[in-house]
Amino acid sequence: MKSLYLIVLMLCFTSVFWHSNNMASEQVVISEHSSHIDLLGKIDWLVTEKSMQLSDIQHLQDWQPSYIPNQVSQDKSLWGKFIIVFDDPDEEQYFLTVGNPHLDYVDVFLLDEKNRILGSFLMGGSRDHTTRPFKHRLFITPISSAQQVITVYLRVNDDGPFI
């Protein structure tokens, strides 16, 4: 029963964030046998001005496999990017979880292979909780496996320091 194979994709940002030393840029392949994937080492990171939008950063070349938390000040945004490839695309529902409920702004953008937006989710502790896709203290985003390849962009802003 495929509906039993829901995957929770966890981004466990210990404290506020965790400094990732692993190489990124690899695709995350999800099969029906996957039950949990820690994405932290598979994300490319970019620190930008707070005013930059998705269209501004999509084609930038400065993405890094890690970031230094003290580079992310109140006037900056931290962007993350990774690619999901579904082994057997179908209508199965998956979930991306950002595991830090203290972040002020967490935005998730899902794009198809032609860079068309499939979904966008604007969440965070400073936003209205009733607009979240799931009533939960963590930031949970649904991801459909109907597309074989999905690029995920994650933007985080926080008025406090990134530790």
Language-model features and meaning:
Residues 7-16:
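Bacterial N-terminal signal peptides
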Residues 1-6:
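Positively charged n-region of N-terminal signal peptides that target proteins for export
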Residues 22-163:
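Soluble non-transmembrane domains of integral membrane proteins
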